[in-house]
């Protein structure tokens, strides 16, 4: 499901009809008592109850998941991602938070200094704290460790926010290939280096 302006403008019933009924053919829907959905969060558990029979599903209300007396919601998770608390996010999700996308062409600066990268846009994702992360990268034919940078590449005076990933042991062209980048650990904030030699040394150290 691609989240965009059109998708976010759906009324609660449109969401139920298109996503729950037609797309997923859901029979049992588990939500917390504070669940909100649809345009401007107009839908809630009473809305779901209202349309149960019409769209042939059963709505089951659960208690919010809490840890240390804090409710763990999608809002809470997004906040942690923005703060770079990736290890905590992964523990709470029960899996690694990831970004999936099609590799786009860059300026090949990474390749020129010996560290080729795969570049992904972050348009449809929560933007993690700018910096360097340990990651796992998955494609149709490999699953490799890597190191990724989220940011603007200040050493090169970059203007566009990108996720750049150096995949260990992979040196081939992956343009237009779909890859999944799973975030494992925040290493350090993004920074500007005096020159390329300093940058290369830091990448090797990372």
Language-model segment annotations:
Residues 2, 33-35, 185-187:
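Short, histidine-centered active-site or binding-site loop motifs used for metal coordination
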Residues 104-206:
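Phosphate/ribose-recognition catalytic cores of enzymes acting on nucleotide-derived substrates
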Residues 1-6, 63:
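A conserved beta-strand->alpha-helix junction
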């Amino acid at each position: 499901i691609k989240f965009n302006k059109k998708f976010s403008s759906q009324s609660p019933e449109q969401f139920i009809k298109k996503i729950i009924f037609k797309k997923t053919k859901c029979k049992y829907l588990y939500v917390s008592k504070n669940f909100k959905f649809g345009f401007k969060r107009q839908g809630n558990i009473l809305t779901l109850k209202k349309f149960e029979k019409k769209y042939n599903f059963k709505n089951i209300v659960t208690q919010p998941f809490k840890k240390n007396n804090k409710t763990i919601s999608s809002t809470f998770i997004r906040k942690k991602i923005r703060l770079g608390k990736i290890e905590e996010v992964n523990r709470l999700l029960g899996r690694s938070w990831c970004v999936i996308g099609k590799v786009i062409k860059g300026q090949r600066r990474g390749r020129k200094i010996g560290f080729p990268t795969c570049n992904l846009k972050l348009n449809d994702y929560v933007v993690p704290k700018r910096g360097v992360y340990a990651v796992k990268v998955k494609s149709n034919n490999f699953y490799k460790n890597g190191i990724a940078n989220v940011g603007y590449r200040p050493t090169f005076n970059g203007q566009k926010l990108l996720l750049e990933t150096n995949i260990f042991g992979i040196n081939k062209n992956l343009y237009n290939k779909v890859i999944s980048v799973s975030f494992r650990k925040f290493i350090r904030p993004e920074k500007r280096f005096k020159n390329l030699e300093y940058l290369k040394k830091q990448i090797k150290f990372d």
